[in-house]
């Protein structure tokens, strides 16, 4: 059986790029904490936007989709699901809300993991929600010619409860070691969870929920305000390649965690960088939405479209962005380049 041992994180032989990533994340985390205390309303608005994006993206990765309008209604208005996909989405909404509101009281324990899985699967009516798999599963891949082959064989169903018990204990043991950086430990645990593949269905979505849970519990909550799952979805080819590399040799305890660690930390770093962009204003001033739009354009080295500004500042309405840009063009602080959908704005 697979042995779960994270002591290598304490031997000082870590790649320099991972050490640098953790340092950069820590610095951005400190800045975000200061801003959160000062700009509570902005963070509340960002959280509402990110929640919709997270629920949409985490399900989309698994091919579970519906319209943006329906996603918003399910998330913000508790609209009843109209079909199977929407039932899956509603279940993820409930599990994510549970983590957002109660992460301090939830832990990486089998009981909590099973409860979150049951919650996630409940709307879709699956009988196996909250239960470990009873049949063995395999991870398939399809080559360019359409041929299927087994890419990975997860832990057999008969060994899954024991493997999950050992994973839980190994994590709790490593977590209590003050010399182990939690940012490096979390990706290792998530990788092992994915390789066990403990459930018949929903393992990928559960891995993202558990990633957020462990990050939040350790104070790294950028994923609340900039969708962690959307970043994964945007760069999912890199995610799956890192997962492939780190799972190679897993069954025989010969795998390297480093590719997956780098991918998860890079995703978290992008969340913090995006969050930082949304506060790109002159220090000392009250951050109004108008000031944030102005600063976003004035601090950019390249021309920006209205759509790009709206993506950077998702809590600011397109109408507000358009009004501010129009005023800036009139005052001469920026100039308009192009026309129609190709219109961009750049500092004069």
Across the structure, where does each feature detected by a protein language model lie?
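FIC/Doc superfamily catalytic core
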Residues: 1-348
């Amino acid at each position: 059986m697979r042995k779960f041992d994270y002591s290598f994180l304490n031997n000082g032989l870590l790649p320099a790029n991972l050490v640098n990533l953790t340092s950069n994340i820590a610095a951005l985390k400190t800045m975000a904490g200061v801003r959160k205390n000062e700009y509570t309303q902005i963070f509340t608005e960002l959280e509402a936007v990110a929640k919709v994006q997270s629920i949409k993206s985490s399900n989309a990765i698994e091919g579970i989709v519906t319209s943006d309008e329906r996603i918003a209604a399910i998330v913000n208005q508790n609209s009843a699901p109209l079909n199977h996909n929407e039932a899956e989405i509603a279940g993820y909404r409930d599990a994510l809300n549970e983590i957002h509101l109660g992460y301090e009281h939830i832990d990486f324990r089998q009981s909590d993991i099973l409860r979150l899985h049951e919650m996630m699967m409940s709307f879709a009516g699956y009988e196996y929600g909250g239960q470990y798999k009873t049949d063995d599963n395999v991870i398939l891949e399809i080559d360019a010619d359409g041929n299927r082959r087994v890419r990975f064989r997860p832990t057999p169903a008969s060994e899954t409860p024991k493997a999950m018990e050992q994973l839980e204990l190994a994590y709790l043991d490593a977590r209590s070691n003050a010399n182990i950086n939690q940012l490096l430990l979390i990706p290792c645990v998530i990788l092992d969870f994915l390789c066990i593949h403990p459930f018949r269905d929903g393992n990928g979505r559960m891995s993202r929920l558990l990633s957020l849970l462990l990050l939040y519990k350790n104070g790294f909550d950028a994923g609340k305000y900039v969708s962690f799952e959307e970043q994964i979805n945007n760069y999912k080819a890199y995610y799956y390649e890192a997962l492939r590399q780190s799972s190679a040799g897993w069954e025989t305890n010969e795998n390297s965690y480093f590719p997956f660690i780098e991918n998860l930390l890079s995703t978290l770093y992008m969340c913090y960088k995006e969050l930082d962009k949304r506060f790109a204003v002159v220090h000392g001033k009250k951050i109004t939405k108008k000031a944030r739009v102005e600063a976003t354009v004035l601090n950019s080295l390249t021309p920006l479209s209205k759509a790009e500004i709206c993506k950077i500042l998702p809590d600011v309405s397109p109408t507000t962005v358009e009004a501010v840009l129009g005023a800036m063009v009139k005052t001469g602080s920026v100039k308009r380049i192009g026309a129609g959908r190709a219109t961009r704005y750049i500092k004069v």
